Regions:
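Aromatic- and acidic-residue-enriched carbohydrate-binding clefts of CAZyme catalytic domains
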Residues: 165-179, 216, 253-254, 260-265, ...
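Alpha-helical cap/lid subdomain in secreted, periplasmic
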Residues: 56-196, 200-207
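Serine-esterase "nucleophile elbow" of acetyl-processing enzymes
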Residues: 1-44, 58-68
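Aromatic-lined substrate-binding rim segments of carbohydrate-active enzymes
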Residues: 237-243, 251-314, 443-450
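A conserved amphipathic helix/loop scaffold
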Residues: 664-890
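Helical hinge/lid and interdomain linker segments adjacent to catalytic or ligand-binding clefts
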Residues: 48, 53, 57-58, 625-704, ...
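Hydrophobic targeting/anchoring helices
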Residues: 456-633, 720-725, 729-733, 743, ...
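Polysaccharide-binding and catalytic clefts of secreted carbohydrate-active enzymes
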Residues: 316-476, 490-491, 497
C-alpha cells in the first residue's frame, strides 16, 4: 500500500541541518506497517496555488495508483495575505486536486491545518478556524474523508497548558542546538515530539485503510452492567453468571460520572478498575463508555447556565439524563478531561476492546436555545452563508418582513404566534446536529490522545442526528433497538442500515436490546413472543453483527426503568426471557465457527436512507408525515416480499448495486445527481420518489422546476404537488386501481419516457429506458403498501429480476435471509421472524448446517422463530455471471 502526502512545512520532511525541526509527515512511517510506502511531497511555504504551479502536485499525482491514499493539508500559507490566495481559490485548488486523484482511483483525504501553539496575544487560540467549516463542507460535497488535525492539536495543546506545550515546538535557548546557535522560539513548526504526536493520531485514523481483517475477530454476546449500582459481591456473582451463560461481553460506565469524579477535578477510578479486573477474570471483554449524558449535581450547581434551555425560554432542571447542553464550554471542558482519563484507564486493561461515546445522543432532548447556542448560532450562520445578504436570499426573508441586517439579528426559532420560516428552522436543526457532531468528534480526539482502541456510539432511528457524519470519525457503527415482534422489519432495518454507515467497515454492534420487553414507570410493555429474541440474535449475527448486547444484566430497583426486563431480576433470579438468554449463549457457540469461515455478501438492491430528509420531515410534514414511519413501511414492503436490500446513504458509492431506490429524498445535491447520472449510464436501474427532489437544500420550494435540479435532469415540466386526502383519487397501474392518500406529485414527461401509472388522467409513474440503464419516477405510492396489489405487481416487474437469491430460494412473508460465502460454499441464513408459519421454496437442493440434514428442492415450512443455515457448494466462479453469484450445488 502507498500513502502520498501533499502540504506545507508542518507536514514536510526536514534535512539534518534543520533538526530538531520535523514535519508530522516525516514521522508518519514510524507508526505504519512496514509494507506501507510513504511518499512526502509537502514543502515549506506551500499554498494550494504554489503546490500546483510549482509542479509538486503533478509529481504527487504520478505516484497515485488505485487505492493510493493521498493526504492533503494546506492553510497556514494560504491564510497569509502576501500569498494572494482567496478562500474561493483555496476551495477551487483543493477541489481540482481531489478530482484528479479520484480520476486515478486514488483515495484523497482532507486534513484541516494543524493549529499554532499561540495566537497574536500569546495565548492558545483558534488561529486557523476559518478553514474548518470550508473543509467540512468540501469533504461533504466531494465525499472524501476529513481528518480534523486542527481541533485535535488545539485540544492537545490545551491539555498540556501553555508552557508545557512548548515541548511540541522548536523552542531553543541560544547555543542549545548547533543548528540554531541564536536560539529559536517557533510556535508553528514542530519538534520531534510534536511531529510524532500528530503522526500517531494520523496513523490511528488510517487504520481502516490498510487493515483488511475485521476489527473484532470474535462475535460478542453480553449485557450492560452497572458496577456503580451494585455491591462488589453482586458484581462478582453477576460476572461469573455471565460466563456460565456463554457471555463474553459487558458494556459499562455510560452513567457513572459522579463515581469517577465525585468532586470537580477529584478523580477516583478504583471501582472502575476493580470491575474491569473482575470481568477479565471471567473472560469478559468490555465496551467502556464515556459517561457524558449524566453530569453530576456538583456540575449543574456550579454551572446552572449549562442546563438545556427549552423553546419557551425555561431551563431544564438537574435529573434524568442529557439535561446539559453539549455546546456549553464548561461542560465540554470537564467532559474532555474526564474522557481522556477514562481512555488512559482503557489502555491499561487488555479486556477493554472498545469505547462508546456518551449514550444515545439526542434520545431525550432535541434543540437547545441557551445563550451559548445563540452565540454559536450566529457564528455558524456567518461561516455557512458568508454574508447576511446571501442568507436572506437563501431563506427568502422578504416574506413577512423577516429580512435581517446582520447575522447577530437572526433569531433563534423560539415561540412565535405561528410558524418560523422553514429555512430558518432547517438551518437551526442543521446547526444542532453539526455542533453535536463536533462535540462527539472532540471526545474522539480526547480518547485518541491515550489509546487507539476502536470507538463507537449507540445511535438509533428515533433520534435527530446526522449519522453519516457522526460516525465518520468513529471506527464502527453501533445502535440500540427495541423493535416490536409484530413489526419485524423495524428490527432488520437496523441491520441493513447500520451495516452500511461506514463505507470501509461492514461490521456493526447491537449495544442495547431487551431480553423480553422494554419499559419504564410510565410505560409497561408486554414481553416478546418466546423465540423472537433468539431469532433476532441469529439473523443479526448473519447480517454482520459483531455484538448482541442486552440492556441490562440485573434489573434496577430504583430510578425509572424498573419494569424493563433483564437477564436477572433485581433480587438475582432469572427474569423474563431467561430461557432465550441461555439459548443464545448456546447458539453463539454453535454458529461462531460458521461465521468465522464466511463473509457477509451484500444485496444488489439498495435503498437510500437520508438523515437530511428526516430533518426536513420534522419541519415540513403536513401534519401527516413521519420520515421514520414512511421509510419503515417502504422498506418493510420489500422485505415482506422476500426482496433483500441494503440501506445506504447519500454519500455511499452506488456502483456495487444493480438497483438503487431513492424514496422521500427531498433534496438532491449536485453530487448525488452526478452519481445518479453515472450509475444509470453504467447500466444501473434508478427508482426515484415519491417526494424525491421536491425541496431545496434550504427547505424551500424550487425556483425553476418543481423537482429542482432533479426535474431538470429528468426533463419533467408542469409539475404540481398537492394532497388528495379526503378526495377520490386513484392510481391506475398494470390494469389495477387503488386509492391514494396525502401528497401526490404529477408531471409531464418527454416523449422518450413511458407513462406507466396515472392518477385521474395525470402522469404519476413514468419510466425511461437508457442505452444501458433505466430510470423510474414515482409521483405517489399506494396508501397501504404491505397489502397493495399494485405495489406487489410493481415489485415483481421492476425488482424481483434483480433479487440476489432469486435462483436459490423464494421466501414468503416473515422469512428473513442473509447471504454469507466462503471460498468454497454459499450459505443462506434464514429465520422466520413472523408470528405465523411461513413458507420458502428451494430451487436447488441444499444442506442444512445446524441439523446436518439434506433439504430437497421444493416447498418447505418454517415455524415462527425457526432458524436454518442452508448451504451449497460452489461449482462455478464467473465474474460475468448475470446473477452475480457462483452457481451452487448441494
Amino acid at each position: 500500500m502507498k500513502i502520498v502526502l501533499g502540504g506545507d512545512s508542518t507536514m514536510a520532511d526536514y534535512p539534518l541541518d534543520q533538526q530538531p525541526m520535523m514535519g508530522w509527515g516525516q514521522a508518519l512511517p514510524s507508526y505504519l506497517p512496514p509494507e506501507v510506502n510513504v511518499r512526502n511531497f509537502a514543502k515549506n511555504g506551500s499554498t494550494t496555488r504554489s503546490f500546483i504551479e510549482e509542479g509538486l502536485f503533478e509529481q504527487l499525482l504520478q505516484e497515485v495508483e488505485p487505492n493510493t491514499v493521498v493526504l492533503l493539508q494546506f492553510g497556514h500559507n494560504d491564510q497569509k495575505e502576501k500569498n494572494h490566495v482567496t478562500m474561493e481559490a483555496y476551495i477551487a485548488h483543493l477541489t481540482d486536486m481531489i478530482r484528479q486523484i479520484k480520476e486515478k482511483a486514488g483515495i484523497p483525504i482532507l486534513c484541516t491545518p494543524v493549529e499554532r501553539r499561540v495566537g497574536e496575544e500569546g495565548r492558545l487560540a483558534h488561529t486557523l478556524s476559518a478553514f474548518l467549516p470550508v473543509l467540512r463542507e468540501l469533504s461533504r460535497t466531494e465525499e472524501v474523508v476529513l481528518f480534523d488535525l486542527n481541533r485535535y492539536t488545539y485540544h492537545y495543546y490545551d491539555t498540556l497548558g501553555l508552557e508545557a506545550s512548548k515541548a511540541l515546538f522548536v523552542w531553543l535557548a541560544p547555543n542549545e542546538h548547533p543548528n540554531y546557535p541564536a536560539g529559536l522560539a517557533d510556535d508553528t513548526h514542530f519538534s520531534k515530539l510534536g511531529a510524532h504526536m500528530i503522526a500517531r493520531y494520523v496513523a490511528i485514523r488510517l487504520q481502516a485503510f490498510f487493515h483488511e481483517q475485521p476489527l473484532f475477530p470474535d462475535i460478542y454476546y453480553g449485557a450492560c452492567m452497572y458496577p456503580e449500582v451494585w455491591s462488589e459481591e453482586i458484581m462478582q456473582s453477576d460476572s461469573h453468571t455471565m460466563k456460565t451463560l456463554g457471555m463474553n461481553f459487558a458494556r459499562i460506565g455510560e452513567f457513572m460520572w459522579r463515581d469517577l469524579e465525585p468532586q470537580p477535578g477529584e478523580y477516583d477510578f478504583s471501582l472502575l478498575e476493580r470491575a474491569l479486573e473482575q470481568y477479565q477474570a471471567n473472560g469478559i471483554d468490555v465496551c467502556l463508555c464515556i459517561p457524558t449524558p449524566t453530569p453530576p449535581r456538583w456540575f449543574t450547581k456550579q454551572y446552572p447556565e449549562a442546563l438545556v434551555t427549552n423553546q419557551d425560554g425555561t431551563k431544564m432542571h438537574h435529573g434524568s439524563r442529557q439535561h446539559v447542553c453539549t455546546n456549553n464550554e464548561d461542560f465540554r471542558r470537564y467532559a474532555y478531561r474526564l474522557t481522556r482519563k477514562i481512555a488512559e484507564i482503557a489502555e491499561k486493561h487488555e479486556n477493554v476492546v472498545m469505547l462508546q461515546l456518551d449514550n444515545e445522543f439526542k434520545c431525550h432532548v432535541d434543540l437547545c436555545y441557551c445563550t451559548t447556542c445563540q452565540t454559536r448560532w450566529h457564528t455558524y450562520l456567518k461561516d455557512s452563508y458568508q454574508s447576511v445578504t446571501n442568507l436572506n436570499e437563501c431563506w427568502g426573508t422578504k416574506v413577512w418582513s423577516e429580512w435581517y441586517d446582520a447575522f447577530e439579528d437572526v433569531v433563534l426559532p423560539l415561540t412565535t404566534p405561528f410558524l418560523h420560516n422553514s429555512s430558518l428552522m432547517n438551518a437551526f436543526r442543521r446547526f444542532t446536529t453539526d455542533t453535536l457532531n463536533e462535540f462527539a468528534h472532540d471526545l474522539c480526539h480526547s480518547i485518541r490522545m491515550e489509546t487507539a482502541l476502536p470507538i463507537t456510539h449507540n445511535s438509533a432511528f428515533g433520534f435527530n442526528l446526522q449519522n453519516d457524519e457522526l460516525f465518520a470519525d468513529l471506527d464502527i457503527a453501533g445502535f440500540d433497538t427495541y423493535a416490536p415482534a409484530d413489526n419485524y422489519p423495524a428490527y432488520t432495518m437496523n441491520l441493513d442500515r447500520w451495516r452500511n454507515v461506514k463505507p470501509r467497515n461492514k461490521e456493526m454492534l447491537l449495544l442495547e436490546t431487551c431480553t423480553a420487553n422494554a419499559g419504564h414507570i410510565e410505560n409497561y410493555a408486554a414481553p416478546r413472543p418466546h423465540g423472537f429474541v433468539t431469532s433476532e440474535a441469529f439473523i443479526g449475527y448473519a447480517g454482520n453483527l459483531k455484538s448482541f448486547c442486552f440492556w441490562h444484566f440485573r434489573g434496577h430497583r430504583y430510578g425509572v426503568e424498573q419494569p424493563h426486563s433483564a437477564v436477572l431480576t433485581a433480587w438475582g433470579e432469572p427474569d423474563r426471557g431467561y430461557e432465550e438468554v441461555v439459548r443464545i449463549g448456546e447458539l453463539r457457540q454453535q454458529i461462531a465457527p460458521l461465521l468465522a469461515e464466511t463473509k457477509y455478501v451484500s444485496a444488489k438492491i439498495a435503498i437510500i436512507y437520508s438523515d437530511y430528509s428526516k430533518r426536513f420531515y420534522t419541519i415540513d410534514h403536513g401534519g401527516v408525515y413521519d420520515y421514520r414511519s414512511l421509510f419503515t413501511e417502504f422498506y418493510g414492503s420489500l422485505i415482506r416480499q422476500g426482496i433483500r436490500v441494503e440501506i445506504i446513504q447519500e454519500n455511499s458509492p452506488l456502483e456495487e448495486y444493480d438497483v438503487v431506490l431513492a424514496p422521500f429524498v427531498r433534496w438532491i445535491s449536485p453530487t448525488l445527481l452526478k452519481k445518479f447520472a453515472a450509475f444509470t449510464e453504467a447500466g444501473g436501474k434508478l427508482i426515484l420518489g415519491p417526494m424525491t427532489g421536491d425541496r431545496t437544500k434550504e427547505l424551500a420550494w424550487p425556483a425553476t422546476n418543481g423537482l429542482d435540479r432533479l426535474g431538470e435532469w429528468l426533463g419533467f415540466d408542469q409539475i404540481q404537488q398537492f394532497t388528495v386526502k379526503g378526495l377520490t383519487y386513484q392510481l391506475t397501474y398494470d390494469g389495477l386501481k387503488e386509492p391514494l392518500d396525502h401528497l401526490v406529485t404529477v408531471f409531464h414527461c418527454p416523449e422518450d419516457w413511458e407513462t406507466i401509472g396515472r392518477g385521474n388522467d395525470q402522469t404519476l409513474l413514468a419510466k425511461k429506458q437508457l442505452a444501458q440503464g433505466e430510470i423510474i419516477y414515482l409521483g405517489a405510492l399506494p396508501s397501504n403498501l404491505p397489502d397493495s396489489l399494485i405495489w406487489q405487481s410493481f415489485c415483481r416487474k421492476e425488482l424481483f429480476p434483480y433479487e440476489s437469491e432469486r435462483q436459490l430460494i423464494k421466501c414468503s412473508e416473515g422469512v428473513m435471509k442473509y447471504r454469507r460465502e466462503s471460498a468454497t460454499h454459499v450459505q443462506l441464513w434464514i429465520s422466520n421472524l413472523g408470528l405465523t408459519t411461513a413458507d420458502f421454496t428451494l430451487h436447488l437442493p441444499g444442506f442444512e448446517r445446524l441439523s446436518g440434514e439434506a433439504l430437497a428442492r421444493g416447498n418447505h415450512r418454517l415455524e415462527p422463530y425457526e432458524n436454518l443455515i442452508i448451504e451449497w457448494e460452489k461449482i462455478v466462479e464467473s465474474e460475468e455471471s448475470d446473477d452475480s453469484f457462483s452457481h451452487p450445488r448441494a
